[in-house]
């Protein structure tokens, strides 16, 4: 998908959420999508790899939480996987401090690549399990918000 078509599809979907993004932010999403699709060829990150589906089911779905957070919140994304919803939130709200927690180191390497390539700041990755970090005083109660998407049932979280 060319960037012009991508921007058009993103803006159509963003309008429904009353969200406006800059050209730079749209380019970050576009690059993120392309890195995701490329890495997914050699590593199973997601079953959703068609550009229009990535836009709707990964990016837009991740951004639906924006109405519940403030731009200067500190957020931990538990079991982030391919970076959803943490990276989309960070792109939309650049001042937000985000920590991406995942148990698989290969996904952490992917996330580090995305963060570096799309030039995100104040976002870090942590390799580990949520149940271990929940008891670590360096991380416990250091975030305004903890988010998770398709990690475990709510009673487990």
Provide a role label for each language-model segment:
Residues 1-2, 6-72, 76, 109, ...:
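Class I SAM-dependent transferase core
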Residues 52, 70, 91-94, 156:
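Ubiquitous "structural anchor" signal
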Residues 78-80:
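Conserved beta-strand/loop positions that form the S-adenosyl-L-methionine
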Residues 82-95:
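Conserved SAM-binding loop of SAM-dependent methyltransferases across substrates and taxa
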Residues 95-99, 103-157:
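S-adenosylmethionine
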């Amino acid at each position: 998908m060319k960037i012009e078509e991508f921007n058009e599809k993103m803006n159509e979907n963003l309008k429904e959420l009353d969200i406006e993004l800059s050209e730079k932010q749209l380019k970050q999403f576009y690059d993120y999508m392309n890195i995701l699709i490329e890495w997914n060829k050699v590593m199973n990150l997601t079953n959703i790899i068609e550009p229009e589906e990535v836009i709707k089911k990964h990016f837009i779905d991740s951004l639906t939480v924006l109405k519940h957070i403030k731009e200067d919140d500190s957020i931990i994304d538990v079991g982030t996987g391919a970076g959803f919803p943490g990276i989309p939130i960070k792109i939309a709200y650049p001042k937000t401090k985000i920590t991406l927690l995942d148990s698989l180191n290969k996904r952490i390497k992917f996330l580090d690549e995305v963060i570096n390539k799309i030039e995100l700041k104040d976002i870090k990755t942590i390799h580990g399990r949520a149940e271990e970090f929940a008891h670590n005083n360096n991380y416990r109660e250091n975030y305004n918000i903890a988010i998770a998407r398709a990690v475990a049932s709510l009673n487990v979280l």
